[in-house]
A protein has these predicted regions:
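Structural signal for beta-propeller blades
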Residues: 1, 40-43, 92-94, 142-144
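Hydrophobic/aromatic beta-strand positions that recur at structurally equivalent sites within the blades
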Residues: 2-5, 45-47, 97
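Gly/Pro-rich loop segments of beta-rich domains
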Residues: 7-22, 49-74, 100-124, 135
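Residue-level detector of Asp-centered blade-edge/turn motifs that repeat once per structural unit
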Residues: 26-29, 78-81, 128-131
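Conserved beta-propeller blade signature
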Residues: 31-34, 84-85, 134-135
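Short loop/turn segments immediately following the C-termini of beta-strands
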Residues: 37, 81, 89, 99, ...
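Loop/turn-rich, solvent-exposed surfaces of beta-rich toroidal or solenoidal domains
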Residues: 93, 117-146
Length: 146
């Protein structure tokens, strides 16, 4: 859904329908990124273009734990280079997908769910600052990691 803050309307506009979206982000070039938890993928849409067919830019290879798969991708962060960071809930990891690559890199967690410093449990919100430091809301452990 999209709501314009300029005209004071309380009625939204459907941009993309029939999707199991959990997280979204918009980059500086006005691309919309969404996580589809049922399809286990991240798609990118041009906001000014055809919103019917997004491009799969990460995952989309069924549910799994390989570096080209997700198991319930949720929160997304997109950096200035259009690299995509994804919280992969059921794999208890955060992955980075370099723009244009077919496989991601595990940059946090991925050691099974747990509370050790190298583990995450249900990673949620995430942010990467200008110094490339990753911050993760580790929901299952009630903590913020960096």
């Amino acid at each position: 859904m999209q709501w314009s803050r300029r005209n004071g309307t309380k009625q939204g506009k459907i941009l993309i329908g029939d999707i199991d979206c959990f997280g979204l982000a918009i980059d500086h070039q006005r691309y919309l990124y969404i996580s589809d938890v049922k399809q286990h993928e991240i798609r990118r849409y041009q906001l000014e273009g055809d919103m019917k067919n997004g491009t799969v830019i990460a995952g989309g290879n069924e549910e799994g734990s390989d570096v080209n798969q997700f198991d319930f991708p949720t929160f997304i962060f997109v950096d200035r280079y259009q690299n995509v960071y994804v919280s992969d809930w059921n794999n208890h990891r955060v992955m980075k997908w370099i723009n244009g690559e077919k496989k991601g890199t595990i940059i946090a967690g991925g050691q099974g769910g747990g509370n050790a410093l190298k583990q995450l449990s249900i990673p949620s919100g995430l942010f990467v600052d200008e110094s490339d430091v990753l911050y993760v809301a580790d929901l299952g452990n009630s903590r913020i990691m960096c």
